[in-house]
Amino acid sequence: MNTRKHYKHCFAVAAYGESPYLPLLLHSLRMQSVESRVIICTSTPNRYITKLSAQFGYPVYVRNGAHGLQQDWNFAYEMGSERSELVTIAHQDDLYFPDYTKALLHAFQHFPDMSVFCCRYDTIDGEGNTIDGSSEKVKRILRLRLKDHAHADRTSVKLSALRYGNGIGCPSCTYHTKYCPAPLFRNDYKFVIDWDTLIRLAREPGRFICIEKPLMAYRVHAGAETMRNIENHNREKEEREVFRKLHSAPVTDVLMHFYKKAYGAYRAEDAGETGTTCS
């Protein structure tokens, strides 16, 4: 990669530990039909990450201090925003299809006031097999009003994708630094950190552009953060808190009744089975 070239877009890879999926992610970024800048950001430097950095030619930036989701994501975003005006925090478990950057830049060309870009995604298991991602099917329904790009700068339209659950897949998001200044993540949540952030951004100037075409793949597996948050009941606690910011207590209770059923569906997806989920 030509490090002196100016890129409008940067993939800031949030790397942690020694994930076996990290090389697959980096390869998917290398295979983009339109080149972007790629950097690797970590709070857990090790020989494995250094080796992959040398293999792919992507520089590594190290954050000093203990590992933490908010701190790591904010660091990746800040490093990316110093290099490009559009930043994607690439999750090490996931994959980006070859035309992700192409679609992103095309959307930005038509809507320069775009604050957040997102897209449909496929769901894959630990082996990379496409599985029934029931949660993404529900998210598509939540995102219906975002199809109207001409009015996607309205707060009501942006919030429509977030009011009854997070209809936007966090790994699919790219943020426009002009409208989304650092620090991007300003809450202390472990699971709904992205949902709460998107709600804040929906209330601020800027347009949410969603492309209803699979441009990436989200991986579910036993070691994923989502699974850990289900097992320790943190997901339920945090989702209830965010719903209460948007709805009355009775409405929140009804929504949580269905959301708790969704936790079992995530386990089913992880096992390669089918299920219905709302989150």
Report the location of each language-model feature:
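N-proximal low-complexity "stem/linker" segments adjacent to membrane-targeting elements
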Residues: 1-28
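Active-site acidic Asp-centered loop
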Residues: 43, 90-92, 118-120
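Short beta-strand-to-loop acidic/aromatic patch adjacent to the donor-nucleotide binding site
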Residues: 84-95
